[in-house]
């Protein structure tokens, strides 16, 4: 049986055409636009890095720490007690609206009754376990030095609201001062420290 043959008469290999400078530039512009769009999408809807300013969350977080915040968390499930959250606190002064991103720990959710007795935080009449509080702070002889607000009357957390507090109770401006916050103002859940490298870890 004859083997099939390939007629290559008149066949001339072609040199690959080199891309024109204009085409290369267009390709690079497309790559940059796609990369920037993806980065913007992630920052707006998925993950964002936040910089810690102030001592209100010590000793969990310190000034100049950087944390990653998951913006998808609360689209998938409810806010839980103990979560560390970043939220937008809106204030008005002289007709000017100001936005300030704060980071605190969730103490009470919708329907919870939160109170403070002798610096002990109670939720639904039970003292909550708070292993994240600084032991040196808890050992201070003065209750005021330990927590600033020694006693607080019971507060029932309204629908779609949260009661939040900083871990550094003497230095934190939180729901003990400005009341509960709307859950819709929560930006996301802080879940990891990414700076400094020596402190990298989950929250």
Task: Report each predicted region and the residues it spans.
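Soluble "head" domains of membrane/secretory-pathway proteins
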Residues: 2-25, 30, 41, 45-51, ...
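Small-residue packing motifs within transmembrane alpha-helices
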Residues: 31-35
